[in-house]
From Swiss-Prot:
Location of the active site: D371
Species of provenance: Escherichia coli O127:H6 (strain E2348/69 / EPEC)
PANTHER family, A to Z: ISOCITRATE DEHYDROGENASE KINASE_PHOSPHATASE (PTHR39559:SF1), PTHR39559
Cellular component, GO annotation: cytoplasm
Reactions that this protein is recorded to catalyse: L-seryl-[isocitrate dehydrogenase] + ATP = O-phospho-L-seryl-[isocitrate dehydrogenase] + ADP + H(+)
Stated role: Bifunctional enzyme which can phosphorylate or dephosphorylate isocitrate dehydrogenase (IDH) on a specific serine residue. This is a regulatory mechanism which enables bacteria to bypass the Krebs cycle via the glyoxylate shunt in response to the source of carbon. When bacteria are grown on glucose, IDH is fully active and unphosphorylated, but when grown on acetate or ethanol, the activity of IDH declines drastically concomitant with its phosphorylation.
Protein name (database record): Isocitrate dehydrogenase kinase/phosphatase
UniProt-listed GO biological process terms: glucose metabolic process; glyoxylate cycle; tricarboxylic acid cycle
UniProt gene name: aceK
Length: 574
């Protein structure tokens, strides 16, 4: 390779990232117009398009580099010099952290995810930690209640860029003040003030005002979801002011926000104060920088691994028929490997399973499907793997494992947030907790279905319970669109003997689903059956599912709320 080519390659990669993030911001900047026009299908399509941008631009850069190098092989010293030149370009670069991830992605695409060493990649950042502790330009505006909170909130709402008419601005402000007074008390509220992000956070059918409620005793989240009536008038649906509520709004089971963030590291740093339980990876994920979130997630894993003496073990719960799942006992994530061979009743391919996981990545997850990060050629030290898990890996996924002596390489896996399997949770709880779990499970099914997702396998073992008590679906190998399913009633038996026969007396085609059968496995436990019949009996009727299908086919997009119905102002104060 001729000398001097290293700088050209480094500049080409950074220019490629500039192009990618420019398109990312362009798609994001259209969120306000899509919201104001109530073009919910365009909202969904923009979300998919934005997710695809990253890989598309990585591919473009890879093709450019192959042209620049004429396809010649590169030696280790050349690659090190490329990284050195790239690193020198970053100190004054505003999106340095994601630029490093983009470099990693280009390298992995060129070299098939091999030789992933700190010398060649940005395994950890080259820049000072939390470089944007001091924000280089204001991300938020302060509002003080000099003339009372009604006046303050009127200024906040009047400053919003939204161009639609408000249904009843004074009413909404009254509800917010009432909530704040009940939460803080009159004296504390009088001594508090607001800091509000300059940009709205758009997701699904809502525009979120995100702020900080700065009180004498500390800083709280201040979140206002703004919705539209059927007549296109704006209203504020609730006010959320606890870290637990904010954590759910920014949760790992939800779609990414569309928020205009030319300085993503600064925005993440600003959000950290009101989302103290979120990792850096989760914060980047929430604002749509999912590829850099993957980088941060891997860094968090490495830091945890360096500081513990644990070994990987098989994850608790019923062993899956498609996935082998393992974890570190104290780590909050699980690792999922597609098995070489599936159980006989699972008539599908590994490619189908991967397609299902990609569907979930791109779809509106409505707070009920866990996000995943996908890795190739994932290296594990053998000393970190328990003997039982090593035997299981070799038994179930040997075709995906390469033995390097002291290490193994797993060709492909997913990393996902760890939860308590719902079947285990139901065994451990009783009373109100049991009732809440069954209510949550049914609500999860309903919300997935309304978003055009049919889970396929609805057994409790395929769902998990989060630290906030929410029920989330995490087993995607049988997932499909609601509109692809044929929901049928079981025909009446022709003769009494039909009900005793080992085979059904009616024909069953691929795609046929009989909701009446759900009762057999969801209500078998005498503690659970009555609760299910009380709260979710309609899930056992085919006409319920067909009615949902009709709404989806008619183009209806359901509202998705990241909070309980009882928290809505229309329920709470009316």
């Amino acid at each position: 390779m001729p000398r001097g080519l290293e700088l050209l390659i480094a500049q080409t990669i950074l220019q490629g990232f500039d192009a990618q993030y420019g398109r990312f911001l362009e798609v994001t900047s259209g969120a306000q117009q899509r919201f104001e026009q109530a073009d919910w299908h365009a909202v969904q399509q923009a979300m998919k398009n934005r997710i695809h941008l990253y890989d598309h631009h990585v591919g473009l850069v890879v093709e450019q580099l192959r042209c620049i190098t004429n396809g010649q092989s590169t030696d280790a010293a050349f690659l090190l010099r490329v990284k050195e030149h790239y690193t020198r370009l970053l100190p004054d670069y505003p999106r340095f952290e994601i630029a490093e991830s983009f470099f990693n992605s280009v390298y992995c695409r060129l070299f098939d995810h091999r030789s992933l060493t700190p010398e060649r990649l940005f395994i950890f950042s080259s820049q000072p930690e939390r470089r944007f502790r001091t924000i280089p330009r204001p991300l938020a505006k302060d509002f003080h209640p000099d003339h009372g909170w009604e006046s303050l909130l009127m200024r906040v709402i009047s400053d919003l860029p939204l161009r639609l008419r408000w249904q009843n601005k004074s009413r909404d402000i009254h509800y917010i003040v009432r909530h704040l007074t009940e939460t803080l008390g009159t004296d504390n509220l009088a001594e508090s003030h607001l800091q509000v992000a300059n940009e709205l956070f758009y997701r699904n059918k809502a525009a979120w005002l995100v702020g900080k409620l700065i009180t004498p005793s500390g800083t709280l989240p201040f979140l206002l979801p703004i919705h539209q009536t059927d007549d296109g008038e704006l209203f504020i649906d609730t006010c959320l002011t606890t870290t637990a509520e904010a954590s759910i709004v920014f949760g790992f089971a939800r779609s990414y926000f569309m928020v205009y963030a030319p300085l993503p590291a600064a925005l993440v740093e600003w959000l950290r104060e009101i989302l103290p339980g979120k990792t850096t990876a989760e914060l980047y994920m929430a604002i749509g920088c999912q590829k850099h979130a993957k980088t941060e997630s891997y860094r968090e894993y490495l830091v945890y691994l360096q500081g513990c003496n644990e070994q990987f073990i098989e994850a608790p719960g019923i062993r899956g028929m498609v996935m082998l799942v393992f974890t570190l006992p104290g780590f909050d994530r699980v690792f999922k490997v597609i098995k070489d061979r599936f159980a006989p009743q699972k008539e599908m391919s590994a490619a189908h399973v991967r397609a299902c996981y990609q569907l979930v990545k791109e779809h509106d997850r409505v707070g009920r499907m866990a996000d995943t990060q996908e890795f190739e050629n994932f290296v594990l030290e053998k000393r970190h793997i328990s003997p039982a898990l090593m035997a299981l890996l070799l038994q179930e996924a040997a075709e995906k494992i390469t033995d390097l002596g002291e290490q193994i390489v797993i060709r492909h896996l997913y990393i996902e947030r760890r939860m308590v399997p719902l079947n285990i949770w139901l065994e451990q709880v009783e009373g109100q907790q049991l009732r809440d779990a069954i209510e949550e499970y049914g609500n999860a099914i309903r919300q997935l279905a309304a978003a055009n997702i049919f889970p396929g396998d609805m057994l409790f073992k395929n769902f998990g319970v989060t630290r906030h008590g929410r029920v989330v679906f995490y087993d995607y190998d049988e997932i499909c669109y609601m509109t692809e399913v044929n929901f049928r009633d079981i025909p009446l038996p022709r003769y009494p003997e039909d009900e005793l026969a080992s085979e059904p007396w009616y024909s069953v085609s691929p795609g046929d689903v009989f909701p009446e059968e759900f009762r057999h496995w969801l209500c078998a436990d005498p503690r659970i059956g009555p609760l299910f019949e009380e709260m979710h009996a309609d899930l056992f009727r085919a006409d319920y599912w067909r009615a949902l299908q009709n709404r989806i086919r008619e183009g209806h997009v359901e509202d998705v709320y990241a909070y309980r119905r009882r928290q809505r102002f229309s329920v709470r104060f009316v």
